[in-house]
């Protein structure tokens, strides 16, 4: 996974479409005025957040994030969105978006299923601050737009949960066509599992057979720059969402046999179990610092069968309980239950 975000040139055109001048946005964001002139626009997480705050401040339109995330013109879709649109189903599209997102940024799309619900969440892995509300709006609108266009029907989330304080409820509920909960413990888009299983009328196996191998080759090339242990831990962190992926699952992600993966890990003096523990520990710290999730919910997302198992593991890692660790590491901007509206 890259440590920088690649900003699509399509964003510049979208800004112009909604009446915003890119240079004014850059000035407001405190970013280099020549940023958008680069052939490949790469920014840090901090710069990305500044960019979206700049867009919000210049626009003053509470719906700007929803507009930017809902692209109607397929010719402006990036390769990840096109691959998603050609997928077999909404589920397949979500999985491809999560997998290929690694190519463009240090961000993860996490998909967690529980009962008859499927929750989609975005995690900014290198963030030291709360993500701008406009960015969340755009990401959620993007997911819903792909689902609606792919199925050819008005696929609506079951609910949307937002950490920020309540603002513009009617606007959000009209766009997503579902209840919106403000002051939530996390930003999450929740679908009925039945809707996630819907087939895509836009499915194109022939074109997907051309595009997917190219994306897989890029992903393989990028992952090859890391040790096998780093690759395994990254995959585990992406797949740990209410489940505990096994060696066979991870080997499949790497296009390796389980025996080959075991041999390579042994060569690096690593074990699958230790990498699982490392991934859980790092994710636990991320959840405790950057969300106000209840501890039993955190345990579930880390693949533990019950909260007590998580508490014991965490105490083994840190020598203290999750709640005490969270309290001792809390500082301004790190942990907060609500986020102010961008407009």
Predicted regions and their residues:
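Short, conserved glycine- and acidic-residue-centered signature motifs
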Residues: 44, 136-139, 277
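N-terminal low-complexity or simple alpha-helical regulatory segments
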Residues: 1-120, 142
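Short, contiguous, pocket-lining structural segments
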Residues: 3, 17, 131, 135, ...
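Generic solvent-exposed, charged/amphipathic alpha-helical segments
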Residues: 56, 98, 140-144, 148, ...
């Amino acid at each position: 996974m890259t440590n920088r975000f690649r900003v699509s040139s399509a964003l510049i055109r979208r800004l112009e479409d909604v009446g915003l001048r890119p240079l004014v946005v850059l000035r407001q964001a405190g970013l280099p005025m020549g940023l958008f002139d680069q052939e490949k626009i790469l920014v840090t997480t901090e710069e990305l957040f500044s960019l979206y705050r700049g867009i919000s401040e210049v626009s003053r339109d509470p719906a700007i994030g929803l507009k930017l995330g809902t692209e109607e013109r397929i010719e402006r879709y990036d390769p990840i969105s096109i691959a998603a649109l050609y997928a077999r189903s909404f589920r397949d599209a979500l999985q491809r978006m999560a997998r290929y997102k690694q190519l463009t940024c240090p961000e993860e799309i996490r998909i967690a299923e529980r009962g008859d619900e499927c929750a989609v969440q975005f995690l900014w892995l290198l963030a030291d601050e709360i993500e701008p509300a406009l960015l969340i709006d755009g990401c959620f609108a993007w997911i819903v737009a792909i689902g609606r266009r792919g199925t050819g029907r008005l696929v609506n989330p079951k609910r949307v949960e937002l950490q920020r304080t309540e603002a513009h409820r009617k606007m959000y509920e009209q766009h997503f066509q579902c209840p919106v909960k403000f002051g939530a413990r996390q930003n999450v888009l929740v679908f009925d599992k039945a809707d996630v299983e819907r087939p895509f009328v836009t499915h194109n196996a022939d074109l997907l057979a051309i595009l997917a191998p190219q994306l897989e080759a890029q992903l393989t090339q990028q992952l090859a720059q890391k040790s096998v242990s780093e690759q395994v831990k990254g995959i585990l962190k992406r797949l740990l969402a209410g489940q505990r992926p096994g060696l066979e699952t991870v080997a499949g992600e790497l296009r390796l046999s389980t025996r080959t993966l075991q041999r390579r890990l042994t060569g690096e003096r690593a074990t699958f179990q230790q990498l699982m523990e490392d991934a859980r520990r790092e994710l636990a710290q991320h959840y405790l610092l950057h969300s106000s999730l209840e501890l039993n919910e955190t345990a579930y997302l880390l693949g533990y069968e019950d909260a007590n198992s998580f508490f014991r593991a965490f105490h083994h890692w840190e020598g203290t309980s999750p709640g005490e660790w969270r309290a001792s590491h809390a500082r301004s901007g790190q942990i907060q239950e609500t986020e102010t509206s961008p407009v």
